[in-house]
């Protein structure tokens, strides 16, 4: 079986649709990247990058600890995606052309993997994540074990029951901000910093907005299946407004951290990402259309989630580039 670097790149950029015949011809890494929805793992990797930059900014960067943090977080997220697909399949959620099976291959629904095969992927990936976590415990001390336990809790219980009882979106905010970035910073440096936790929220709000958008996109489907995501509980219209509010709050929190002196004034440059938010605002004024709009990118049925991802990518790139400049200025100034 030949290695397929072209598919590796594709699977890291989008969630590719593949037939059963195409799947059988793929190498094991390509299959793993598709099954774990590797294109979305970039959000987790960027959280690890931010934790590393904050550690470097504080003069406490440890490359090997950061590398294990990044690897462990990505593997944990991949494990969660696999368990998500398994849980939804055995609970009957993904049948009847459910949203998840429309935007990319669901390994069980599309017959790419057996239940045993998917659980094997999850077990191996989860074991690798656990091993990196245990290595960090040995390197950095027992307090890291608490962060490892918290991460394991969310990996195992996000899909059920948290997502079903309107706690999934809150879990995402906690995980991608305080836990991944704040906890990652602590694991790398050995010091807890509440300013770093606060500084993690602009990025975490973007990720949460993307998840919120996905849950609005499948509002009717989740409502029928009694999956009580926050949009189902709060209503579709209010949820659209909350997503926009979260995106605006990303900028306001960054400006606040500039005002109190945690950041240098260069971080106010995140306003350069605002045109991407302005561009998607019209989409959030009305409910999701029944059919794909003319000229809409080829990501349907992703609609609000696609808009959120577009803004989050723009904000994230600008935020990280400015944070690097901010870090250099901070270190030069002493």
Locate each region found by the language model.
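Extended hydrophobic alpha-helices typical of membrane-associated regions
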Residues: 259-332
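Membrane-embedded alpha-helical segments that form the functional core of polytopic membrane enzymes
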Residues: 49-50, 58-86, 145-156, 193-213
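Functional transmembrane core segments of multi-pass inner-membrane proteins
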Residues: 172-225, 240
């Amino acid at each position: 079986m030949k290695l397929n670097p072209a598919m590796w790149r594709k699977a890291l950029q989008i969630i590719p649709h593949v037939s059963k015949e195409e799947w059988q011809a793929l190498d094991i890494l390509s299959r793993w990247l598709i099954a774990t929805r590797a294109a979305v793992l970039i959000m987790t990797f960027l959280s690890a990058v931010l934790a590393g930059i904050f550690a470097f900014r504080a003069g406490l960067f440890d490359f090997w600890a950061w590398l294990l943090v990044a690897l462990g977080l990505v593997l944990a997220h991949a494990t969660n995606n696999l368990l998500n697909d398994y849980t939804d399949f055995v609970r009957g959620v993904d049948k009847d052309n459910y949203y998840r099976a429309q935007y990319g291959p669901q390994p069980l629904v599309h017959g790419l993997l057996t239940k045993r095969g998917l659980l094997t992927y999850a077990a191996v990936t989860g074991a690798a994540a656990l091993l990196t976590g245990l290595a960090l415990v040995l390197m950095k001390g027992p307090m890291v074990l608490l962060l490892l336990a918290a991460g394991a809790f969310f990996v195992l219980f996000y899909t059920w029951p948290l997502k079903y009882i309107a706690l999934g979106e809150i879990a995402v905010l906690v995980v991608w901000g305080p836990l991944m970035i704040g906890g990652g910073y602590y694991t790398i440096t050995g010091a807890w910093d509440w300013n770093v936790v606060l500084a993690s929220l602009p990025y975490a709000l973007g990720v949460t907005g993307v998840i919120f958008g996905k849950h609005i996109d499948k509002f009717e489907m989740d409502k029928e299946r009694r999956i009580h995501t926050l949009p189902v509980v709060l209503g579709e219209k209010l949820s659209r407004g909350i997503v926009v509010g979260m995106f605006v709050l990303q900028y306001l929190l960054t400006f606040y951290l500039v005002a109190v002196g945690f950041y240098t004034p260069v971080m106010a440059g995140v306003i350069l990402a605002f045109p991407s938010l302005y561009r998607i605002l019209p989409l959030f004024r009305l409910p999701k259309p029944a059919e794909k709009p003319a000229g809409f990118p080829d990501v349907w049925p992703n609609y609000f989630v696609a808009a959120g991802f577009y803004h989050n990518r723009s904000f994230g790139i600008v935020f990280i580039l400015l944070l690097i400049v901010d870090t250099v200025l901070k270190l030069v100034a002493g």
